[in-house]
């Protein structure tokens, strides 16, 4: 699911006036499932390339929502995409046990692919290799720490808002064996859960 907002207005509309816009577009992060951490939403910014040139007018921005956790061994679905003009960041890939990995901006566990669909520069990284690994983040793949939960992949910093803030970290994995430590969160991702029995 995504939400649309008409939030940008430059000038009175039309007239051929061109503006340079600095942007940061981060998609929704995915929920975890059956021990694995969810992948972060895709991270795309003009700081990696150059400002976007757009004409005066109204623009709709779509903000991708996160996907929640799921019970049992099912995979959490991919989260929502975020869109600004020609820039689309893909929602993070969900995680589950014994189910196909979810690809996305950053991938879910069991090697879910990040940067899907591929863009340059990359919008994210792969999920960790095991069911209790962390989800991928904007600057690092999800980590494995078997049998404890793996850390989510690191996110990235952006100064678009005027100060440096970390975004798009992967979710931590849950311990596969009861009473093992969960994986820590990274840069906006959620920490893993604990299994007690």
Please give the residue ranges for each predicted region:
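Low-complexity, glycine/proline-biased repetitive segments and flexible coils/loops
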Residues: 2-197
């Amino acid at each position: 699911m995504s939400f649309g907002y008409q939030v940008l207005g430059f000038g009175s509309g039309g007239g051929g006036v061109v503006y340079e816009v600095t942007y940061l577009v981060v998609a929704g992060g995915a929920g975890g499932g059956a021990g694995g951490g969810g992948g972060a939403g895709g991270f795309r910014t003009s700081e990696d390339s150059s400002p976007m040139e757009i004409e005066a007018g109204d623009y709709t921005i779509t903000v991708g929502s996160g996907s929640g956790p799921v019970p049992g061994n099912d995979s959490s679905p991919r989260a929502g995409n975020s869109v600004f003009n020609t820039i689309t960041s893909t929602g993070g890939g969900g995680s589950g046990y014994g189910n196909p990995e979810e690809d996305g901006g950053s991938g879910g566990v069991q090697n879910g692919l990040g940067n899907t669909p591929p863009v340059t520069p990359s919008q994210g990284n792969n999920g960790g290799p095991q069911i209790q690994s962390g989800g991928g983040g904007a600057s690092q793949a999800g980590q494995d720490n078997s049998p404890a939960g793996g850390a989510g992949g690191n996110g990235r910093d952006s100064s678009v808002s005027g100060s440096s803030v970390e975004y798009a970290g992967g979710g931590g994995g849950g311990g596969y064996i009861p009473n093992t430590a969960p994986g820590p969160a990274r840069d906006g991702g959620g920490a893993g859960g604990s299994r007690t029995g």
